[in-house]
Amino acid sequence: MPAAPRSKPLKRPTQARSKFTVQAIYDAFVRIWNAHGWEGVTTRAVALETGIAVGTLYDYFPDKEALLSGYVRHCIEALLARIDTEAVVPTDIDWRERVRRLVRLTCDTRLEGLPAFDHEMLMLEHRVAEPKHHRRVYDELAERWLRAFAACTDLRPAPSPATLHALLTAAWGGRRYRLLVQPEGDKDDGSNSSSWVREMEAMVMARLQAR
C-alpha cells in the first residue's frame, strides 16, 4: 500500500508582506512548541498567537504537519544563507578561518541567529520529509562546501571532492546523530556540544594538513 502523501506548505511567500506574515507564523509556532510541545500546536493556536485569521494561516499551511514541513525548510534555508554569508562570500579571511566557520556552521545546533531545531522536531521529521528531501539538503550543503573550499585559494593542494564529501558526511551526520541521541551534557548547558564542535574543527584541520 503506497504511503499517504505528506502535508506540505501550499505556497511560498514572495512579497515582503507575505514573508513577514510567514516569519511571524514560524515565530508563533516555536513559542507554542517551547511552551506546550507538539500536542499544543494547532492551526488555531498558531493563528491566535500570530494575531492573524485562521483563514490567512490556511492560505499557507493546511495543517500543522505542513507548518512543520515549512519550518524545517526554513531552518535549512537560514543555515545555507548563513554559510554563504560567513564562509563562502568573504574575501578577507584565510583558509583556516573559512574552514573553521564552515565546520562550526555545519555542526553547531546552538548558533545565535539561526532558527531553533531540536530533538523533538527531529523525532517528527519523518512525518514531513521523504528521502528525496534529505538528498536535496545534502546536495545543497555539499555545494556550499565545494564553493567554500574553492574560495580557499591559499590552501594548496586543494582537497579532492571525495575528501570534502567525507568531511561533510562526518560533520552533518554527527550533528544529526547527536540531536537524536542527546549525549549527556547537550541537554544542560551545551558544554559537551561545544566540545564536540571544537573536536570536529580539529579533525577537519588535521585531515587538510595531512595531505
Locate predicted features.
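Helix-turn-helix
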Residues: 20, 24, 28, 32-66, ...
